[in-house]
């Protein structure tokens, strides 16, 4: 499918934190909708902007109530919630996409977003767009993804009978849409991922909002998701690292001493598969009580692997 930029663009939002936005006119008669997005910590920081300038510009430009949940300890996700008229909410989310797809011209020292998040719901379901998917290959970087949080009953309305409604959204707005198969933790919420140009995503949001109002499922009694850590002892964060079998011994160390020290330093549990997989790799499974510890253990294992590879090359 070729993605095209919408011929009827949403009003331009703030492209940078420094831009001042004129207050938008609010239609008091228009029905209000509230939509929620799942964000990574890095995405949340970009949308907030320095001193909250970016989100404030989006708020003023579109006349919406918009905010991001507080950062919870041991959580790698935050929620964005926006309330306003259908058009205002859709256009503000188009502005969010523009912020997330803008070049990091002011973030020279920022680390790139990791390809895989330990909190699996942050990992995009859809693959990144390729240049041949855009009508203008030079604009492919403007294509973004949103993780819209929807309840199970809302999913049914959005998909429609035999997928008729979601197919129409895809065809009409030259966008890609997919619904997660699993619920967000401790909730009846799922992710509706939308990929496309900002204006195309805005038009999708408008149609989705109209559908939710028409089917009377905009406000449901289903259990909603909120980032939470519970008590430390109840948290179980897991990640796996595949290591070529020939390097496993070196990473374990004499008598398992090296891996034991790594466990102690990172405060994680690390187990190693007894048998290699079809790629002749053995999986290291890391389990801990928080994202940071597990990620640290993961990085240290990969660093040790790189060091061992270099050592062997030098001996050749």
Swiss-Prot record:
Residues 9-24 have a biased composition (Low complexity). SMART domains: KH. InterPro entries: KH_dom (IPR004087), KH_dom_type_1 (IPR004088), KH_dom_type_1_sf (IPR036612). It comes from the Eukaryota. Belongs to the HEK2 family. Binds RNA. RNA-binding protein involved in the correct localization of transcripts in the cell. RNA localization is a widespread mechanism for achieving localized protein synthesis. Involved in structural and functional organization of telomeric chromatin and regulates silencing at the HMR locus. This is Heterogeneous nuclear rnp K-like protein 2. It comes from Eremothecium gossypii (strain ATCC 10895 / CBS 109.51 / FGSC 9923 / NRRL Y-1056). The gene is HEK2.
């Amino acid at each position: 499918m070729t993605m095209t930029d919408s011929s009827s663009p949403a009003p331009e939002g703030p492209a940078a934190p420094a831009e001042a936005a004129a207050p938008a006119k609010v239609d008091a008669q228009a029905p209000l909708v509230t939509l929620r997005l799942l964000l990574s910590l890095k995405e949340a920081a970009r949308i907030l902007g320095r001193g909250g300038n970016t989100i404030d510009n989006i708020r003023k430009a579109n006349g919406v109530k918009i905010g991001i949940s507080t950062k919870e300890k041991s959580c790698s996700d935050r929620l964005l919630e926006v309330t306003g008229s259908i058009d205002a909410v859709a256009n503000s989310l188009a502005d969010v996409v523009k912020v997330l797809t803008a070049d990091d011209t002011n973030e020279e020292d920022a680390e790139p977003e990791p390809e895989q998040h330990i909190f699996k719901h942050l990992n995009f379901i859809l693959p990144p767009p390729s240049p041949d998917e855009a009508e203008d290959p030079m604009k492919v970087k403007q294509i973004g993804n949103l993780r819209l949080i929807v309840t199970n009953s809302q999913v049914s309305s959005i998909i429609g009978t035999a997928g008729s409604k979601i197919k129409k959204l895809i065809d009409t707005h030259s966008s890609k849409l997919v619904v997660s198969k699993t619920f967000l933790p401790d909730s009846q919420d799922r992710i509706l991922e939308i990929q496309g140009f900002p204006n195309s995503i805005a038009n999708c949001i408008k149609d989705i909002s109209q559908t939710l109002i028409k089917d009377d499922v905009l406000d449901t009694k289903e259990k909603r998701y909120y980032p939470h850590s519970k008590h430390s002892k109840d948290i179980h964060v897991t990640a796996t690292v595949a290591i070529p079998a020939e390097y496993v011994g070196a990473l374990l160390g004499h008598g398992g001493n090296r891996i034991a020290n790594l466990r102690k330093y990172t405060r994680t549990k690390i187990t190693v598969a007894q048998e290699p997989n079809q790629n002749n790799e053995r999986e290291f499974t890391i389990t801990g009580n928080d994202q940071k510890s597990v990620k640290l253990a993961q990085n240290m294992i990969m660093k040790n692997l790189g060091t061992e590879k270099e050592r062997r090359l030098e001996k050749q």
